[in-house]
Every structure is written in C-alpha cells, then in structure tokens.
C-alpha cells in the first residue's frame, strides 16, 4: 500500500499551508495513507529555534522586503520520518526551520518537492526583489539564481547569508536526479528551469487544487441577503482585496492599490465613488475606515472557506495588485466563486486571469492602468460582468478543480512509487 509523508511547516497558516492540506485530502479521498508532519503544535523549543534564525537572518541587509529564511535547524519529526525511506516523502513549504539546509542530503530517494515560492533555488530570499518602478518587474534584472550568487554583492551589507545558503543548497540538490519538483505556475516553471540549482532537475507543473464545491457562486437571493447582513445595498459596487497582513504586506501590492484608488477618484464622478465599497480580508484587525477616500470594511482573517467563498461571491470584483504570486490562490478562488478579477499581468496570475475573458489584466506595475481597469469593470453592465464571471468559473473548473489536479497528482504518486519499488527489487 502506498504511504505518503506530507511535510509542511503548517497546515493552517498561509496559502502554502492550505495548498499542502488540500493535496493531503486528495490522497485521503483516494484511500492513500497520509502522515501529516507539521509544526502547528510543535512547542516552545521549535519556536525558540525560529527566533534564533530570525535574529541571525537580520544580519543581512539587502533592501528586499520579502521574507528571508536561513533554515539552520530541522524539526525532529521530519528528520525521523526519513527512517521510513519506503514511504513517499512529499515536501511542501519547509521554511521556519522545518527542514535544515544541512539535512538536504538526507532527503530520501524519489521524494516530491513542491515549491510555493522561489526560496529553494534562491539564496535566503523567498522571492527575487521586484522593483515596482520597473514595468517588467524583475524579469530584466540581473538574476542571481540564474547567474550564481557572489560573495561580494552590490547592495548587500552585513553577512551575505544568500551566498552561503545558496552554495549549501546547490551542493546538496543540483546533482540529485531522483527528486521530482513541482511548481504551481508556468512562470515558476520557467524560472526554476533557468536556476543553477534546479536546471537539470525533473520539474513538473502541478497547480494548486481549488475546491469548486466550496468556492462557488451564491444564488441571487443568497447574495443579496449576504450583502444586506454586511451592511451593503444592492446598488453598492463591492471590491474585495485579500492578503495575509492585509494592505500592509508589500508583496501583495497594498501601496499599488492605494495609488490606483487615488487615480480612480479622478476617473469617476463623486456619485460613482460613493457607490464603491472596499472589503479587505486577511489582516488581523477589523475596522470600518476610509481607504484612499473610499469606504472600506476590514473583516479580519477568515478561516472558514465557505464564509470566504460567500464574501467573494457577494463582491462585484476582486482586485489583486500583487507584485508577484507563485500561483494566485485568491484569483482562482474568486473566479470559482464567479467574481471577475483585476490584476497585474505578472508571475502566476498570468495562468489564471485572462484579459477580457475572466477579468482585466494590466501591465506591471502601472497603477494608472490598474485604476482604469477597475473603472472599466465598474462600468460594465451587470450581464457583462456575469458573463465574465461565468467564464472565470468555467476556466477554474477546467484547469484547477480537484478532479483535474488529482488525476495529475496520482499519476505522479504512482510514478514515484514504481521507482521506489524498482529500487527495492534491485
């Protein structure tokens, strides 16, 4: 019988955790045995190690606001699981000292490694720094993960952890031919294949699964009732924006959204502006205060997927001003809930939002164009928005639903299991 060790820092905190949990549930639904190994209840010692790592990584100064990780330490149950080498080990987000870079050489043969960001083939940064003032994002910059990290690097002060950690990862992984890596988007597939660490590796496209039975549209009656309960009228134009940390997370484009809304005020009348209501989820605080001159309701962190789906469905449009997304979970969930999306045409979002069909995409990171896209969405007729919304759900069903992703996932599991069995025979 196939047994999978599913390893992730968390199964509840963040998009990577939710994706990992969904992959585990796909296995369980098909009768595959799964051991979930995570740090959700790991205790004080694990927390202490993460604090040490957090302090040490701050010794590198590189002006990149993205999360940085050293991964000096391992969570003991993860390393202990390597004793069960006949089981399939599927690694998800292994940062926050879930698996140490010094234990990478112990990863069992024929394991699966799912990348939820760029950390594995970069230094200590989870994404290459994106310059919002560069219209093409980071694509035209000198990329260290392709050209190699240098000990002396302009712009880095203090300890150059990126150089050291990249060297350790490269030594441990670049020659491994038995690990299968999966990535959730074509953008990440292209970048991983160009990286020095993974350029010779077996890398597959495996998008995050979306539960279309949970993320689905409300009926017209349910939608009106939900909006009424939240204090919104039928004539209000609801714009939803979601991110861990809310609009304060720089990678999620809070600054770009603020600039876009400031532009939007000059593109519409005061009467139309008063109809627009913002809903922000994902931040810790709940409040009702203006954001860039627009009425705004911050609803906090939402843990119930059904409630989140209802929130998406109640909105007229979802805005995703992210600078970079490995996949675009919010975009896919919104579309599955029949809510069209406005976003920059960047990174993993390009796989999900099709300009003019499932939403509007604009050139990165043109906030005036973003404002115009919101305006265009606002002035679409109700039927035009509904048509776009239906196309969006159909696209998610056809490309990211459980049935589609599970078929590819089980094919990979069976392939890896066959290789393990062949190794046993040898």
Identify the meaning behind each predicted range:
Residues 187, 209:
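Carbohydrate-associated surface elements
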Residues 268-277, 282-309:
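Nucleotide-activated donor-binding/catalytic signature segment of Leloir-type glycosyltransferases, i.e.
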Residues 310-315:
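Short alpha-helical donor nucleotide-sugar binding micro-motif in glycosyltransferases
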Residues 323:
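Aromatic "clamp/platform" in nucleotide-sugar-dependent glycosyltransferases that forms part
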Residues 340-343:
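Short hydrophobic beta-strand element within catalytic cores of glycosyltransferases
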Residues 355-356, 360-367, 376-382:
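Conserved acidic donor-binding segment of nucleotide-sugar-dependent glycosyltransferases
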Residues 384-399, 405-411:
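A short, well-ordered alpha-helix in the C-terminal region of glycosyltransferases
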């Amino acid at each position: 019988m196939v047994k999978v060790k599913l390893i992730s820092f968390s199964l509840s905190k963040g998009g990577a955790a939710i994706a990992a949990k969904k992959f585990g549930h796909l296995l369980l639904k098909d009768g595959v045995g799964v051991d979930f190994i995570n740090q959700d209840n790991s205790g004080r010692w694990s927390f202490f190690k993460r604090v040490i790592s957090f302090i040490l990584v701050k010794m590198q100064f590189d002006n990149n606001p993205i999360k940085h990780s050293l991964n000096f330490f391992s969570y003991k149950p993860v390393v202990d699981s390597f004793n069960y080498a006949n089981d399939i080990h599927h690694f998800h987000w292994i940062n926050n000292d879930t698996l140490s870079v010094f234990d990478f050489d112990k990863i069992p043969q024929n394991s699966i490694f799912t990348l939820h960001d760029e950390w594995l083939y970069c230094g200590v940064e989870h994404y290459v720094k994106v310059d919002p003032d560069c219209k093409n994002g980071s694509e035209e910059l000198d990329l260290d993960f392709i050209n190699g990290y240098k000990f002396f690097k302009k712009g880095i002060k203090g300890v150059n952890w990126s150089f050291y950690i990249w060297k350790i990862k490269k030594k441990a992984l670049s020659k491994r031919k038995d690990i299968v890596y999966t990535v959730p988007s074509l953008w990440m597939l292209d970048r991983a294949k160009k990286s020095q660490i993974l350029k010779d590796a077996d890398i597959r496209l495996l998008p995050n699964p979306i539960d279309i039975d949970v993320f689905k549209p409300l009926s017209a009656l349910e939608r009106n009732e939900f909006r009424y309960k939240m204090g919104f009228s039928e004539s209000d134009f609801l714009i939803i924006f979601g991110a861990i940390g809310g609009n304060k997370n720089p990678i999620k484009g809070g600054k770009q959204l603020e600039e876009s809304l400031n532009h939007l005020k000059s593109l519409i009348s005061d009467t139309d502006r008063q109809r627009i209501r913002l809903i922000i989820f994902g931040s810790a605080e709940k409040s009702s205060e203006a954001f860039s001159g627009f009425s705004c309701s911050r609803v906090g962190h939402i843990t119930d997927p059904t409630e989140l789906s209802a929130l998406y469905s109640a909105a007229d449009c979802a805005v995703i001003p992210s600078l970079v997304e490995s996949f675009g979970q919010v975009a896919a969930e919104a579309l599955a809930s029949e809510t069209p999306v406005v976003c920059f045409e960047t990174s993993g979002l390009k796989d999900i939002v099709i300009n003019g069909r499932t939403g509007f995409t604009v050139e990165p990171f043109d906030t005036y164009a973003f404002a115009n896209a919101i305006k265009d969405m606002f002035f679409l007729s109700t039927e035009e928005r509904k048509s776009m919304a239906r196309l969006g759900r159909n696209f998610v069903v056809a490309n990211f639903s459980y049935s589609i992703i599970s078929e590819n996932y089980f094919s990979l599991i069976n392939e890896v299991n066959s290789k393990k069995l062949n190794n046993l025979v040898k």
